Amino acid sequence: HAVHLDPVKGAQAIFLSEFLYRILTAPLPDEHLYDHLASSLTFWEGLRRGGANYHLCLLISLLPVLGISPEISERPEGAGWCFSLSEQGYVLDRHAHCLSPEETLHLPQLLRMTYANMHHFAYSRQQRGVILDYLLDYYRLHLASFPQLKCLPILRQLGEAELEGKHLPSQP
C-alpha cells in the first residue's frame, strides 16, 4: 500500500521521518546502519497489512546496530525486580527510568520482535504508545543529543480524534 493511501503508514511515515532525522547525525557514513535501514524500509513499503507494530520493530532492530542494545539476562528470582532503562539491568529500587515489574516480565519477549513475527504481537493502541514511550526514553538515555520528538503529541491528538470520530480544526 502506498503511504498516502494508508493512514497507519502515513502516521508511521511522519514519526519515522523525525526519528531517523534525529539518529542519522553521525559525521561519517555508517554502511551497516544504512543497509539495515534500506532493507527495513523496503520491507515496510511492501507491507499490505499487519504493520501496526512496524515502528516498534524498527526501533528495536536498530538497538544493536547503534550499539545500545540492552543486555537482557535472566531476571533475578523473587518479586519486585524492575528493568532500569538507564542502568540497562535489573534493580529492586524502582526509579523514574524503570519498567514496572509486570512490564519487566514482558521485556525479553518484546525484544525478540522481528519483521517476520511482529504481526503476532497483539498490542492495543495504548500499549503501543507505552512501549514507544519507553523505547524513546531508552534512546534519549543512551544516545547523546537525542531529543523529545515533536511529532508525537500531534500524532497522538490525531489518533484520538480519529478514534472519537472528531475532525480537528483546519488551519486557515
Per-range role (PLM):
Residues 1-172:
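Non-catalytic alpha-helical scaffolds and adjoining flexible linkers that form interface surfaces
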